[in-house]
Amino acid sequence: MYKRQVLTLLIFLKILNPAFIKSVSYLSFDLYQKIFAEERESEVVIIDIDEQSLGKFGQFPWNRTVFAKILDQLNTSNPKAIGFDIFFTEKDKQSPDEIIKSYNLIPSDVSELQNLKGPDDLFAEKLKESKSIIAVLGSNVPSHANYNRKAKARFLSKGGKPEEFTYAYPYSIGSLEKLEKNVQGLGSISFLDQLDGIIRSLPL
């Protein structure tokens, strides 16, 4: 009898105040994470875009040659993977093509610039030489940075249909196609909002 009353109360709370039930669920989940937390040594290194780096390289976004040099430096340590959680959605403003478009140059200067390798091309080459992954974000609205990108990883499933339990985005936001085609993988940084602003799960 007691169990039935508790169950009835929970059902009414679920209907009348679903946010309360979710809050209790979040608290329980967080408590379990603290009780059963596993201590692990992390070998992850974060390269932060902070005030010091902005003072050295100038305002963001930086020239893509800066990122090419960063990759060169990182590759000396033979990392297992290099992930970028920023987007490179537009051409580098300091690329030869963009300079030619922006300024009224004499033909000889135009010819000289056209023979130069652009920052995006250099960055793409360095990405190809590295174990690099670039971020992709799921979106519900179309973006100029969208094209018919395909996943680089293979997906295997067993049992039911996983698409019935995963959140699907109609569009995606990422980087220039030239850059994405030269990385080893595309990593999703999509997340679903929760009531308290804490990320506990990620949509596949």
Each model region followed by its residue ranges:
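Non-transmembrane functional regions of envelope-associated proteins
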Residues: K3-L204
